[in-house]
């Protein structure tokens, strides 16, 4: 038992038990632990999503790491993120941040894409999963978020009291990355992608529980 505990403490992003990984001082719940790997990107620890898995029906993201924190009513998630290079699979790539997660059928997420919502209505915006397919809850107006293939500085701020969520990418936000929904309430936050590869580093989650 002591040997197992020591091994778990030493393996930062290797599963210690089913579908759990560790990175950035947190434990994360994932569908398949071997799809993720803690690597070093430019001398900085980075969590890499190595396997793009297609979305199942109903249509919503499943390939994301969910932080094992309390259910936060107010939460801020900050990170540097890097999308899959377009040339790798000739795709229009994206990343996502989950928030107000209650279970696999009830959560919200911010979708950050190389194209705008005006180009593709189910890209680059705020979405809600409520037992079925994801539904857009933000306007479609605004530019693409992932405008280059380097590291992006990303910040999501969610206030469960007012229902407002806003996302900044490289210091900029837009109507498509802002939404208000008072039904969402408290939940957990996570990082990942719909069905693309990606890297995440300098991830920090702070929040406040519901009183």
PLM regions with names:
Residues 18-42:
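Extracellular carbohydrate-recognition regions
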Residues 33, 168-188:
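Short, solvent-exposed beta-strand-to-loop segments that form ligand-recognition rims
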Residues 39-63:
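Short carbohydrate-recognition loop motifs
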Residues 57-128:
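Secretory/extracellular carbohydrate-interaction modules
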Residues 63-70, 139-146, 189-190:
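Beta-strand-rich interaction surfaces with strong enrichment in secreted/lumenal proteins
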Residues 79, 150-160, 165-167:
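Short tryptophan-centered beta-strand motifs in secreted/extracellular beta-sheet-rich domains
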Residues 130-153:
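Short, aromatic/His-centered strand-loop micro-motif at the edge of beta-sheets
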Residues 181-211:
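Ligand-recognition surfaces built from glycine- and aromatic
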């Amino acid at each position: 038992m002591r040997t197992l505990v020591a091994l778990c403490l030493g393996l930062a992003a290797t599963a210690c038990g089913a579908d759990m990984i560790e990175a950035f001082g947190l434990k994360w719940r994932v569908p398949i632990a071997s799809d993720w790997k803690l690597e070093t990107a430019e001398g900085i620890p980075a969590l890499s999503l190595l396997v793009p898995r297609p979305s199942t029906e109903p249509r919503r993201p499943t390939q994301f790491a969910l932080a094992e924190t309390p259910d936060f009513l107010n939460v801020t998630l900050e990170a540097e993120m890097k999308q899959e290079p377009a040339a790798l699979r000739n795709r229009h790539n994206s990343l996502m941040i989950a928030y107000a997660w209650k279970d696999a059928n009830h959560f919200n997420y911010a979708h950050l894409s190389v194209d705008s919502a005006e180009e593709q209505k189910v890209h680059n915006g705020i979405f809600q999963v409520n037992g079925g397919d994801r539904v857009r809850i933000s306007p479609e107006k605004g530019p693409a978020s992932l405008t280059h293939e380097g590291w992006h500085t990303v910040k999501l701020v969610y206030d469960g009291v007012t229902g407002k969520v806003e996302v900044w990418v490289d210091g900029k936000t837009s109507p498509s990355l802002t939404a208000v929904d008072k039904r969402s309430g408290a939940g957990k936050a996570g990082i990942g992608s719909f069905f693309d590869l990606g890297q995440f580093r300098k991830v920090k989650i702070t929040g406040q529980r519901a009183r």
